Regions:
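Ubiquitous "structural anchor" signal
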Residues: 12-13, 22, 40, 60
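Glycine/small-residue-rich loop that forms an oxyanion/phosphate-binding "nest" at active or ligand-binding sites
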Residues: 13-29
Length: 182
């Protein structure tokens, strides 16, 4: 599981820091890159949450919008200046594994991010998008379970029961996978 956190250095997706990528941690970037490369090679299940989804995309060859408000001016608000959640709707793709977990269609999710997928990594597909087109979930169809979600399911377990299903699906696939040599 790759969790939320600080921004990823734009160096990893061959862009200059526009000044909007902030609080970068080179050690975290390097360690998550190595973890993702190993897990993808060995087909070890991955659940990327918020920064974790962005790391999946970047370290598999994609890129990021460094700051949604200044680069896109999106219709949806995806973050606030404090730790209070912003909520918006996403549309889950029928063909994605996320639709099997949460159900196809529209779902309300929390949002704490100011960055988002710009160029999708090769081999990945979009699992969900916000109404403004911002990518909210990605997956790798050629792997057993590689799913990235932009929201934090752990923060709204009680309010949004579907969030429990995401964590449960990841635990189940990891349990089924535990006998494999890592």
């Amino acid at each position: 599981m790759l969790t939320g956190g600080v921004d990823i250095s734009p160096d990893y997706y061959h862009e200059k820091n526009t000044g909007k990528s902030r609080s970068i941690c080179p050690l975290l970037d390097k360690s998550e890159k190595l973890l993702i490369e190993h897990a993808m090679k060995k087909d070890i299940p991955i659940l990327g949450i918020c920064r974790g989804m962005q790391a999946l995309n970047v370290f598999c060859g994609g890129s990021l919008i460094q700051d949604i408000p200044s680069e896109i001016g999106a219709a949806e608000i995806h973050s606030s200046e404090n730790e209070n959640a912003v909520f918006h709707n996403i549309q889950i793709s029928k063909s994605s594994p996320l639709s099997k977990i949460m159900g196809f269609g529209s779902h309300r999710v929390n949002s704490y991010h100011h960055q988002a997928v710009k160029k999708l990594a090769s081999g990945f597909s979009i699992a969900a998008s916000a109404t403004d087109g911002i990518v909210e979930a990605i997956f790798c169809p050629s792997k057993k379970f590689v799913l990235g979600i932009q929201w934090h399911p752990e923060r709204d377990i009680d309010a949004v029961p579907e969030n429990t299903k995401i964590i449960s699906a990841f635990i189940k696939i990891c349990t089924d996978n535990e006998r494999r040599t890592i």
